[in-house]
Amino acid sequence: MSRYDLVERLNGTFRQIEQHLAALSDNLQQHSLLIASVFSLPQVTKEAEHAPLDTIEVTQHLGKEAEALALRHYRHLFIQQQSENRSSKAAVRLPGVLCYQVDNATQLDLENQVQRINQLKTTFEQMVTVESGLPSAARFEWVHRHLPGLITLNAYRTLTLINNPATIRFGWANKHIIKNLSRDEVLSQLKKSLASPRSVPPWTREQWQFKLEREYQDIAALPQQAKLKIKRPVKVQPIARIWYKGQQKQVQHACPSPIIALINTDNGAGVPDIGGLENYDADNIQHRFKPQAQPLRLIIPRLHLYVAD
C-alpha cells in the first residue's frame, strides 16, 4: 500500500472516530441517567510535565455536571481544545462513571456502538505504530503533519463499558514497567549505541561516548547468567474496582476516562453503590498486599536497569 493510501485511510478512520463519538454522546443523552460521578484532577502545566506527582487533589462532580464533563472528555482529541498552559505531553485523565438505564434492545445498541468506536481506535493506532513503518521518534511529526494538534493518546484510548455492576470503588495504582533481560541482550543494545556516536545534552559527543563505554564495561564484568531487570516507574494511575454480585467476582480497570455502566432494568438490575476517590498522597500509601521484593542493585540509572543480587 502506498504512503498516500495510508494517509487517506488514517484521515478517514479518524473522521469516523469523531463521528461515532458524537453519535454516542447524543445516544447516551437520550437515556435516563441514573447516577454519575467523575473526579477532575489538577491541570498539569508545561513546566511541571516531567515532575513526579507526590500529591493529587481530587474534585468530585455529580449528576448532569459530571455527565457533561465526561461526554466532553471522550471527544477531547486536540490540544486546541485545552488551555495553552496545559501540558500536551501529560495525559488528561477524568476517572469516574456514568450509569444509564437500559433495556435489552438499547443495551445491545450501546454495546455495539462502543465496540465500533474501540475497533476504530485500535485500527487508527495500528496505522500509526505499525503500518507507517516509522520509528517512534518520527511518528509524532508524521501524524501531526496530517492531523495538527492531535493528542494521540486520547485518540488511541478506548472506552470502557460494563453491565450491571453491584459496586464501583475508585483508587490509585503505582506501577512499574518491568522487563527482564540477559547480560548479552544489554551488551548488544549498548554496542549499537556505541556504534552511532552522538551528543546527548548536557554531555558532548565525546562525554556521552565515554559514559556508554563505562556502562558497557560494567555490564561486561557481570557473570553471563546475571539476571538484569528494567524497572521503570509509571506515574500513578486512577483505577476502578468493579464488583459483580451475580458472578461473585471483582474486576479491576484502569480508569483514565469515565466508565460507561449500563443498568438493565429488564433483568432486574439496580443502581450500583459508587464510592469516592481519595486525594493521592505518595507519603501515605497503604498497601493491601505487598510481596517481598527481590533484592536489586541499580547499575545503569538512566535505563532504570537493575541487577539481582
Swiss-Prot record:
One of its GO terms (biological process) is DNA replication termination. Trans-acting protein required for termination of DNA replication. Binds to DNA replication terminator sequences (terA to terF) to prevent the passage of replication forks. The termination efficiency will be affected by the affinity of this protein for the terminator sequence. This is DNA replication terminus site-binding protein. Its main location: cytoplasm. Pfam families: Ter (PF05472). GO terms for cellular component: cytoplasm. Belongs to the Tus family. It is found in: Cytoplasm. The keyword ATP-binding does not apply. It comes from the Bacteria. SUPFAM superfamilies: Replication terminator protein (Tus). The lineage of its organism: Bacteria, Pseudomonadati, Pseudomonadota, Gammaproteobacteria, Enterobacterales. NCBIfam families: rep_term_tus (TIGR02648). It comes from Salmonella typhi.
